[in-house]
């Protein structure tokens, strides 16, 4: 990633110097990290110390400022200061590791604010069910902006941000590659909500209100497209030997067939779907993020970009 005019660029060594307070080191172990890693992603205790603890410290400051501003605003408007969650958006390509980043941020906030409710959802649940995608002839466009029920997603975020005591988000299954009928993640008055998905920073032309209108801080997980392709195909190969072996899995027919055919299919999906989606709709949103985590080989974060203005 080239240097951007509106971002400060910090090397890993520079970034880790911004927070050296050992009193707030989260008691995580390598085993804990393994539990939250998305499949085939990698994260280490060094990453937590060098990258995520400074990041969490920054978010802590942003959160405290947010609470202060909410109080100031309510006094000025002569209105009751209703609970409205601090929302963090996490975006990036398929297979880049944004899920792991979101899960780790959830753990860090739960540690830093044990008396506050932190919850995490993904925008996957707001994809249209496969049956509807087929009716709309959009199965080959799954993951593209038009495959999401944006009206429902925006209404959900509005309910949460408005302080409604309960909001329901549909659940997506990577096992069946579809929305799970009548199953929901229940969001109950969170103080902090992390929302993760490829479309968190997008500005759909048919929407007057965007996901980013509800977020108070956003992070984009970035890497070279060739690296992401490698990670995507590595993950697919690994899943062929594990989750895809389950007869109920959507990809089971590929797992029991010719491996060469399966890999050819995965490569086609990368080229025609994921790479196109990245180049046309995801990567152009990168410069809307407040912070960019840049990865190199082996999912190592080598640089952090922080928005100037």
UniProtKB/Swiss-Prot annotation:
Q: Give the pathway listed in the UniProt entry for this protein.
A: Cofactor biosynthesis; coenzyme A biosynthesis; CoA from (R)-pantothenate: step 1/5
Q: Which GO terms describe its cellular component?
A: cytoplasm
List the catalysed reactions: (R)-pantothenate + ATP = (R)-4'-phosphopantothenate + ADP + H(+)
Report the EC code(s) recorded for this entry.
2.7.1.33
What compartments host this protein? Cytoplasm
Q: Which domain of life is it from?
A: Bacteria
Pfam families registered for this protein in UniProt: PRK (PF00485)
Return the protein name.
Pantothenate kinase
Q: What organism does the UniProt record list as the source? A: Lactiplantibacillus plantarum (strain ATCC BAA-793 / NCIMB 8826 / WCFS1) (Lactobacillus plantarum)
What gene name is listed for this protein? Answer: coaA
